[in-house]
């Protein structure tokens, strides 16, 4: 007889970590490996921001923003962010969208609506959620919590490579400085500071390939849920 799961809800794997730690790529591949749903929580805020711009909803119109967020048709598939079934992965990285995301996130009802949308991604057969507070705030009962990190030098090198491959100019020293400043802000903020959950497994990817990181997360999950 197969053992029963040691929890009563749909399993969730959370993968948190600082910027450029590789958590998004690893989360997408872990989800694909296990056949789980995927949540890119950072992209969710930008998707809401993009939709508000498309529908010309003002950043201060809280009621309209909350209704918009409740009605959004959002999916994450193979690392792509889709709005109403259309890939908008590139569009949500625009500076205008980032600025709007920051502007709407200051409203508590908007943040609450986005938290509810994040939790709604929890569906059978399971969910892999990546972000900064997935294990500490959003899915505190996750069966596996992973906190991914890497040296700031390794993260800057990865970000530099990504930008160059996409045709953007990039300066490694500027990237190093930006990452250090962002790490400081994220770790010191009052609301949901960036930190590992008390029961998280730490995964330093400084010297690991993407495949090695994915394999480690899958092994951890299968050890916790042997019949998965």
Swiss-Prot record:
Principal location listed in the UniProt entry: cytoplasm
GO MF annotation list: ATP binding; CMP kinase activity; dCMP kinase activity
InterPro entries, sorted: Cytidylate_kin (IPR003136), Cytidylate_kinase_dom (IPR011994), P-loop_NTPase (IPR027417)
SUPFAM superfamilies for this protein: P-loop containing nucleoside triphosphate hydrolases
Protein family per UniProt: Belongs to the cytidylate kinase family. Type 1 subfamily.
Organism of derivation: Paraburkholderia xenovorans (strain LB400)
GO biological process: pyrimidine nucleotide metabolic process
Localization annotation: Cytoplasm
Source domain of life: Bacteria
Gene Ontology CC terms, in alphabetical order: cytoplasm
Classification lineage: Bacteria, Pseudomonadati, Pseudomonadota, Betaproteobacteria, Burkholderiales
Binding site for ATP: 17-25
Gene (name only): cmk
UniProt entry tagged with the keyword Transferase: yes
HAMAP family hit by this protein: Cytidyl_kinase_type1
EC number: 2.7.4.25
Protein name (database record): Cytidylate kinase
CDD domains according to UniProt: CMPK
Entry annotated with the keyword Kinase: yes
Reaction equation(s) it catalyzes: CMP + ATP = CDP + ADP; dCMP + ATP = dCDP + ADP
